[in-house]
């Protein structure tokens, strides 16, 4: 992390540099005008992780600055949500005099929401005993006088929860209130307000759709739930078990009755669609009954593998969100043979870094 780059006064210049870089990267393609969605310049990250440094009686958060090649003390952290910044000094002052809770504590993770919940995970290089558990309960009770907080203690093969290991985020998306169960230690979009802009963009590009939607890599149902209003039915796949459980929770919480989640990888689903293999997890699901004209993909940094690209090319419309423009570029070399790029977008999920969250909407030629 380059802490020196985190200057709100230079934010607009840094965002424009990303816009220029992204447009240059895709010059070989016939792309429409680049849309871009900016971030807040401070307090935009809903989660943060800090290592802990012990120095005599002192105890403080730190991060490693790659530019300086050294650790940097972080009493406050500009990118983190206001709630995390409010919690940081209160928590560390309670930990400093507590020899049981601070002993062998090496990391603290925070997960917060725009709706005011915060989850704190304390990570240790020791086993957590009954004495630690008693002190953790007191800590949670003390923090609860100021915060809507839950607490987790983690050590090797241990996870102690006081009282929940998740938060519930509430987002206003295109005038509709959506709730999302976000579990500790699983993927969620880090920038809450930009995540809303991503959902609204996806709703907009698919607003006149017909038939059904297929989503690969659906996570906790973040996009599927928001997009269900635009389709007759939605079929979504996700491999990670905690994310699938969150997705099922979110379906019920948001009263979505036209969304089916399947726990399997995109690669296995591709084989199932091609009738190469049959899977027990698909028993009772008639894939042929779905009339999916649109496919939504938000793959890992590695992008889509060759077989999944071929699967995706079979759909009339493709919504592709990417956390790695280089792998999106590689995938578009094939996808552009069969589809036109009709929308092109940059979401600044990660201000003050080189990371770019981008997206395209493609329609069959």
From Swiss-Prot:
Pfam families cross-referenced by the UniProt entry: tRNA_U5-meth_tr
Entry GO terms, CC: cytosol
Catalytic activity reported: uridine(54) in tRNA + S-adenosyl-L-methionine = 5-methyluridine(54) in tRNA + S-adenosyl-L-homocysteine + H(+); uridine(341) in tmRNA + S-adenosyl-L-methionine = 5-methyluridine(341) in tmRNA + S-adenosyl-L-homocysteine + H(+)
A GO molecular-function annotation: tRNA binding
Lineage: superkingdom: Bacteria
InterPro entries: MeTrfase_TrmA_AS (IPR030390), MeTrfase_TrmA_CS (IPR030391), SAM-dependent_MTases_sf (IPR029063), TrmA_MeTrfase (IPR011869), U5_MeTrfase_fam (IPR010280)
Enzyme class: transferase
Binding site for S-adenosyl-L-methionine: 189, 217, 222, 238, 298
Active site per database record: 323, 357
Keywords: Methyltransferase, S-adenosyl-L-methionine, Transferase, tRNA processing
EC code(s) of this entry: 2.1.1.-, 2.1.1.35
BP GO terms, sorted: tRNA methylation
Entries under PANTHER family matching the protein: TRNA/TMRNA (URACIL-C(5))-METHYLTRANSFERASE (PTHR47790), TRNA_TMRNA (URACIL-C(5))-METHYLTRANSFERASE (PTHR47790:SF2)
Record function comment: Dual-specificity methyltransferase that catalyzes the formation of 5-methyluridine at position 54 (m5U54) in all tRNAs, and that of position 341 (m5U341) in tmRNA (transfer-mRNA).
HAMAP family recorded: RNA_methyltr_TrmA
Assigned protein family: Belongs to the class I-like SAM-binding methyltransferase superfamily. RNA M5U methyltransferase family. TrmA subfamily.
Xref: NCBIfam families: trmA_only (TIGR02143)
Name this polypeptide is given: tRNA/tmRNA (uracil-C(5))-methyltransferase
Organism: Shewanella piezotolerans (strain WP3 / JCM 13877)
